[in-house]
Design a protein with these regions (language model features):
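C-terminal non-catalytic regions of proteins with extracellular/luminal or membrane-system context
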Residues: 1-173
Length: 173
């Protein structure tokens, strides 16, 4: 659902040949169902779709996300605990171990258009958790934020959105 389209950012202009794709969820696309629902295992993720349409994306960013967390950890929802099925992954934009100044400068030079991907999966037998269970460090422990639910933005996602909004002329979330 398109809620806002300020300055006609979408559809992308025919002149837009490059974009920066921010957000770990861009590298671990969500296509799923839970409980008695099902999902067609054949799908196209955002990065493949951009490539198919002839739009280049910044691989320095996507490589960092893939290194940070190589994929979604598989969880059997019927037998999982909330801290397993409700995990959120996102490095903080302010953490220079992930977002180096060089990377951020390169991204600004690469394109003035940014796409931010945020993902959640919940459904039958896989309820949205009342806390946030998140990993913000590569290989780090799961951190619990009791002040926010799974359906709210994480602090890291808010920081990312604030950064991208302040630094890019065209932003798609």
């Amino acid at each position: 659902v398109l809620v806002q389209n300020n300055d006609n950012t979408l559809p992308l202009s025919a002149d837009t040949k490059k974009v920066n794709v921010f957000g770990w969820a861009s590298t671990a696309w969500l296509g799923g169902g839970s409980g008695s629902g099902g999902v067609n295992a054949v799908n196209t993720d955002l990065l493949a779709a951009l490539t198919a349409y002839g739009i280049e994306y910044n691989t320095e960013l996507t490589d960092m996300y893939k290194d940070f967390q190589p994929g979604r950890e598989y969880v059997r929802t019927l037998s999982s605990r909330p801290e397993q099925s409700g995990r959120l992954y996102e490095p903080d934009i302010n953490n220079t171990a992930y977002y180096t100044q060089s990377m951020l400068d390169n991204a600004k030079s690469f394109s003035d258009t940014a796409v931010v991907v945020i993902g959640r999966l919940a459904g039958e037998s896989n309820d949205a958790t009342k806390q946030q269970y998140k990993r913000t460090e590569k290989g780090g422990d799961i951190v619990v934020d009791d002040t926010r639910t799974m359906l709210e933005l994480t602090t890291e996602e808010e920081n990312l959105l604030n950064y991208v909004g302040a630094n890019y002329a065209h932003v798609v979330v």
